[in-house]
Amino acid sequence: MLGILVLRLRTERGGHYSMFPGKLLHGALFRCIAAYDPAFASELHARKMKPFTIGFFRRTGRSATAVLRAQELNEPHYAEGEELLLRLTALDENVLAALLRIPLGTVLAAGQLSFIVEEILADGRENTGVIAEEELIAAALSAEDAQKIRVSFRSPTVFRVDKDDCAVPRPSLIFASLADKWTWQELPFAVDKDIVRMVAAKLI
């Protein structure tokens, strides 16, 4: 099973970050997984690729497509009591189970700030949902040929190219990265990364 979830949070201890808090949020979610299944969390920690992704805090009432200013992205400030949304994706059914079962009222400590989990959305609201891999594949294969694909990045995103990081979201890098994640998770239906990269390189 694959899932896209959104945590509705309330800021317990406000303040600001001096840089993008991605690693802090990653650590907070890992602690939630460890609380649910310590043995699985240890095994997960040893993996090269982690089967989940974490988005960025979005203030309630703000459109998901709103463009963030650089300061708001890199040095965000959150007030006590402020409501936020945090988007997660799970590419592993054990991770999905752990995230869906985060107890309401759990405090996510991310650096000097902390946030209380008030609701977990996975029912279609905020473009969330859970789907079986086979169902996703069937839907993709039965869909009409896409004429246009739009990808929006709402948090700092880089792609590994040889020994360097590339911040330019070229189609070949985007879809090759997705192919890697699919393969590393040993999801059904083989994906040939070289073919994916070749086709994606033709996109403009």
Question: Language-model segments: what does each one mean?
Answer:
Residues 1-204:
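RNA-interacting cores
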